[in-house]
Amino acid sequence: PIAGSMVLAAILLKLGGYGIIRMMQILPTTKTDMFLPFIVLALWGAILANLTCLQQTDLKSLIAYSSISHMGLVVAAIIIQTPWGLSGAMALMIAHGFTSSALFCLANTTYERTHTRILILTRGLHNILPMATTWWLLTNLMNIAIPPTMNFTGELLIMSALFNWCPTTIIMLGLSMLITASYSLHMFLSTQMGPTPLNNQTEPTHSREHLLMILHLIPLMMISMKPELII
């Protein structure tokens, strides 16, 4: 069910990050070198999840692996136990909660009209659902973490914290963000661009679907304008 996917991506997946934050408070803060294997493992897991996204043909699976890759960055930022790392992790968890939930909602909107989640079979929707294409563009840009969104703030804080802790981590972070941009653009182009299937009879988007997207993006934009609420 789409509601379960939205709750899982937006709330339940972030409970793991919250649990790690609480556990790190009782661990020694001066011996972060002992956590180096876990940080490398988290960043490597994020890269592998991003590479898995590139080879996905199922729209819902692609969005799910995207959530896993972002949580890898969150775990790495939490483990180094710095104020910037914790602030970036909190910002990225909240921002990606809204973004991934919105992407699952859009995937369901597409599935209800095409009855398939295969990327190549959902192409050409910009000709018949232009407003939905606008929502797809906005959510994909937020998934890429362009400024001035909260996603960008979180990733910038995480990148700065990890770079100050160990400069070589910038290689893995940069590679992860490059692949994130690649699969996000691939997802948008595969579902929206191209010729429209001739036998595809769809109905226009409803006000309920637009309201769902507004309720996802407006709070995220408001938090982006005043990040002091969570950082």
Curated annotation (Swiss-Prot):
It comes from the Eukaryota. Keywords: Electron transport, Membrane, Mitochondrion, NAD, Respiratory chain, Translocase, Transmembrane, Transmembrane helix, Transport, Ubiquinone. It is a multi-pass membrane protein. InterPro entries: NADH_UbQ_OxRdtase (IPR003918), ND/Mrp_TM (IPR001750). It catalyses: a ubiquinone + NADH + 5 H(+)(in) = a ubiquinol + NAD(+) + 4 H(+)(out). It is found in: Mitochondrion membrane. It holds the Pfam family Proton_antipo_M. Coiled coil: none annotated. The chain crosses the membrane at residues 1-21, 34-54, 63-85, 89-111, 128-148, 156-176, 211-231. GO terms for biological process: ATP synthesis coupled electron transport; electron transport coupled proton transport. The keyword Transmembrane applies. Core subunit of the mitochondrial membrane respiratory chain NADH dehydrogenase (Complex I) that is believed to belong to the minimal assembly required for catalysis. Complex I functions in the transfer of electrons from NADH to the respiratory chain. The immediate electron acceptor for the enzyme is believed to be ubiquinone. Belongs to the complex I subunit 4 family. This is NADH-ubiquinone oxidoreductase chain 4. The lineage of its organism: Eukaryota, Metazoa, Chordata, Craniata, Vertebrata. The gene is MT-ND4.
